[in-house]
Amino acid sequence: MGIVVPTMKASVIEVLLVLLVTGIHSNKETPKKTKRPKLTVPQINCDVKAGKIINPEFMVKCPAGCQDPKYHVYGTGVYASYSSVCGAAIHSGVLDNSGGKILVRKVAGQSGYKGSYSNGVQSLSLPRWRESFIVAESKPQKGVAYPSTLTYSSSKTAAAKAGETTKAYEKPSIPGTTIQPVTLTQAQATPVAEVTHRSTSKPFAASVTNSPRPQPVGHRSQEMEEVDGWKPGPVLLDSGFVPKEELSTQSSEPVPQGDPNCKIDLSFLIDGSTSIGKRRFRIQKQFLADVVQALDIGPAGPLVGVVQYGDNPATQFNLKTHMNSQDLKTAIEKITQRGGLSNVGRAISFVTKTFFSKANGNRGGAPNVAVVMVDGWPTDKVEEVSRVARESGINVFFITVEGAAERDIQHVVEPGFASKAVCRTNGFYSFNVQSWLSLHKTVQPLVKRVCDTDRLACSKTCLNSADIGFVIDGSSSMGTSNFRTVLQFVANLSKEFEISDTDTRVGAVQYTYEQRLEFGFDKYNSKADILSAIRRVGYWSGGTSTGAAIQYALEQLFKKSKPNKRKVMIIITDGRSYDDVRIPAMAAYQKGVITYAIGIAWAAQDELEVMATHPAKDHSFFVDDFDNLYKIAPRIIQNICTEFNSQPRN
């Protein structure tokens, strides 16, 4: 019995070893059973655009030679789906011109695709497009199956020719979600009523399925939307779906850009009063349509909105409603007459307060223009509301048709209303048309004037229309620390202005017994460059010859000022001048230079008043300590603007 027990133990151990070896062998064989097949990456040509491919995420192989400029690319980083897929891949740096595999993912459309030159490809700008895409290196995500055959929106694909109208693949995996199979069906035309997002072009109804109920391709799951980096609006993968606020004209081509030489934001105020009658109202609409056609409307050129007035004004459509001439003409034709009085003043006030806003499509950098059409004369006053419009930067034009005859003057609420309303009373902004039948002759003259942006004087504001020259005391009494405080004061004033070559320009002179030009008006064209230049000014040290410094600034700085710029000199000193300041100050006045005199500590107030432009109380300032200098900056800016807004209108 003692021999049997060890034998049984040996048998048990032998069985356990066999089972262990068998299990290990079985585990080694398991991976072979679940090994994934090799990924097949479809190849595309250089000219294939992302918008032609329905799949929301896919891998493709690009051939060599896609760097050719004939393969257009729109955007930088995020590309409009009208772009060449392979061209965008080269531009982004994912590929070079030898070709290769890439990963493509569709994202929502956006506004403002910026062009740039990168990796031998010049991408173009585009105001907006309905769908975008991004490209990345071809590194498949774990657990994601990419389509081996692409589904196109056109029937000219291999899949369509072979009758393969449906391809199945899996959605990209998203953390926290379960991968669902997605089915894409070859695009077929469907009625607009069947589509959630309305489109004026023919939509196609490719279906995306992640549940038993089919959904349009234009819709993605909530999980997909949550991981999108760009979310300006609805996510639109279907190139047939376009929100109507994004594009008024649906086309497979980029939207018309408009005339870049006439970039204005224009509001037409049309007369819808009862007195104009139906026939003349139709003539007015035809005139408006002819002007719109001549302007060449587009996002890079002029934009037009229409306000109709009677008893009260109403916006027919704003600046961003229609982005090309043809759509505008169609919209104008549909305008119906309101009736009522001719309350022009109320309409101008309405436009000033509400029309030129960002929400209505105002672009900020484009001049604001209002063209007011009047049959006869207004039934309310226009002078005060027009003054507010001018001060708001609106260039008001008046077209008066069949104005008051001598016998009718007594009935006019405000005689000379047009001259009181327009931007300038120099004839440039007024049209007096004798008959509605001759109104068509005004089309070209009006277009020429509203597009002459250099003469749109009311676009100029106190912050964007001056040449400002600082004349800075660098004498020994200043000291290094106080001089830096003065430079900070100069920077604080400068940053309040809109600085560019066509807006406000800034220059600086430093003086002691001698003078030197730190930088002229044409040296720097941006606010950042100006502020940087001010910081770099070095302290000179020496005497105080303010009179000579004024004369030097007139000759070396303001002599190069532009004719249409307001010339403003700001003198900053901490002591009495060693030389006479009266004659140089008079010379500045005679040359049209507005002088502000800023005195600190030991500066002589009587001398400040001599140098300052009349009235001295508005143009001379004194602080007893350098640390209080910053306090007067807002008052100086306010006075500059008050003076600008009160300038003679001629």
From Swiss-Prot:
Disulfide-linked positions: C46-C62, C66-C86
Residue ranges, annotated region (Disordered): 198-226
GO cellular component: extracellular matrix; extracellular region; interstitial matrix
UniProt keyword NAD present: no
Gene Ontology molecular function, alphabetical: glycosaminoglycan binding
The entry's keywords: Disulfide bond, Extracellular matrix, Glycoprotein, Neurogenesis, Repeat, Secreted, Signal
Positions annotated as glycosylated: N492
Residue ranges occupied by any LCCL domain in the UniProt entry: 40-133
Induction text: Highly up-regulated in the injured spinal cord.
Entry's localization field: Secreted, Extracellular space, Extracellular matrix
Predominant subcellular localization, coarse grouping: secreted
Signal peptide per UniProt: 1-26
Entry's Gene Ontology BP terms: extracellular matrix organization; positive regulation of cell-substrate adhesion; spinal cord development
Phenotypic effect of disruption: Embryos show decreased spinal cord size associated with reduced cell proliferation and altered cell differentiation in the central canal of the neural tube.
Cell membrane as UniProt keyword: no
Domain VWFA stretches: 265-450, 467-640
Main function: Promotes matrix assembly and cell adhesiveness. Plays a role in spinal cord formation by regulating the proliferation and differentiation of neural stem cells.
Subunit structure: Binds dermatan sulfate and chondroitin sulfate.
The protein, known as: Vitrin
Organism: Mus musculus (Mouse)
Gene: Vit
